[in-house]
């Protein structure tokens, strides 16, 4: 048994309760984060190691969660491939999208030095974090990363040009995915080298295309990135949001832990992925916009589930929304920590 309830659980060790952390826990749901945003832009905070470290640790102090996740963005990989990224206005956008480029493979050039500030941020986080709190590193999944690279921006998670482009020239897309994979492996291994204790791959748009197409074009990349991390002895988490019944292709050969969205109950997922896999998820973040009574009601399922399954990390089906009252997040953390899990 270690100091960290998160690391014990992801290693299959039974603890007195499930660990709790949230995707997007270091973000707009926190008043302390919004105070910093009054002074600094998002990209500025991300690229300043001191600020990135500070933001990463805000939810540890403010919410009492059991793990920190690096404050960064999935779109640093396209930047490291030479694309110019901006966060001005409504979300991320690229100066030139791949759909507007005649030869995407020549357009993409390796600039791994663009990621150096992130490794400095990791060093700073490890200098200042509490001992019992592990740091989770991450990168975007290949499909999700390429969605943004190809379209150039996202409006309401809509990528109208991207999916037809896969069908038009699958061979080209596979070559672009290979470039994303190569840079993602380099990035992931550097994070491990600098001290992250677990690594999550965010495939936020896994449900955008048919499962068989995902399996052919993108899943080999997922295996390569997570496999490289696992070879270093670091536990891996895979979030395939929207994959639905396609989750049956997620097994222990692919990752150590699968992060589940809100579409399927945990007990059904457990039946599909088997007993060895650690589960993470899958409280619907939108419940946190309701009343404490509604939270109590929904929490009951998770309490009953966690009494039977210790290989489970309490998290959300996706990230915290800016509209969620921070009091409700605090309330949920308290419920996880103070409930009787019968272990």
Q: What are the language-model segments listed below?
A:
Residues 35-53, 105-114, 145-159:
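An N-terminal domain-start capping segment
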Residues 114-343:
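Active-site loop segments of alpha/beta catalytic cores
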Residues 70-86, 105-110, 196-214, 317:
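Glycine-rich, proline-tolerant flexible connector loops at the mouths of alpha/beta enzymes
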Residues 86-99, 155-162:
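A charged helix-plus-loop insertion that forms the helical arch/lid used to bind
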Residues 1-89, 215, 224, 324-343:
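N-terminal basic, low-complexity leaders that serve as flexible interaction/assembly modules and, when applicable
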């Amino acid at each position: 048994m270690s100091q960290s309830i998160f690391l014990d659980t992801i290693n299959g060790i039974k603890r007195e309760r499930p660990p709790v952390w949230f995707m997007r826990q270091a973000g707009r749901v926190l008043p302390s984060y919004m105070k910093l945003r009054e002074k600094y832009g998002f990209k500025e905070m991300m690229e300043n190691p001191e600020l990135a470290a500070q933001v990463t640790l805000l939810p540890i102090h403010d919410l009492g969660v059991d793990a920190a996740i690096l404050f960064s963005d999935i779109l640093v990989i396209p930047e490291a491939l030479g694309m110019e990224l901006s966060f001005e206005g409504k979300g991320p956008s690229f100066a030139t999208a791949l759909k507007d480029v005649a030869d995407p493979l020549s357009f993409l050039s390796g600039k791994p030095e663009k990621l150096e500030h992130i490794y400095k941020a990791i060093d700073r986080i490890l200098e200042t974090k509490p001992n019992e709190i592990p740091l989770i590193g991450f990168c975007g999944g290949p499909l999700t990363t390429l969605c943004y690279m190809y379209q150039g921006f996202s409006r309401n998670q809509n990528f109208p040009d991207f999916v037809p482009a896969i069908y038009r020239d699958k061979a080209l897309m596979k070559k672009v995915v290979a470039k994303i994979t190569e840079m993602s492996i380099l990035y992931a291994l550097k994070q491990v080298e600098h001290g992250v204790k677990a690594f999550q791959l965010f495939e936020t748009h896994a449900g955008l295309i048919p499962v068989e197409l995902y399996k052919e074009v993108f899943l080999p990349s997922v295996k390569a990135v997570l496999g490289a991390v696992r070879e270093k002895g670091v536990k891996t988490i895979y979030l395939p949001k929207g994959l639905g019944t396609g989750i049956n292709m997620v097994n222990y050969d692919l990752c150590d832990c699968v992060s589940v969205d809100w579409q399927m109950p945990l007990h059904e997922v457990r039946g599909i992925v088997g007993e060895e896999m650690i589960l993470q998820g899958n409280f619907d973040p939108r419940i946190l916009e309701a009343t404490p009574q509604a939270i109590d009601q929904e929490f009951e399922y998770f309490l009953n589930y966690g009494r039977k399954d210790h290989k489970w990390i309490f998290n959300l089906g996706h990230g915290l929304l800016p509209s969620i009252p921070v009091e409700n997040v605090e309330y949920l953390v308290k419920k996880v920590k103070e409930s009787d899990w019968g272990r």
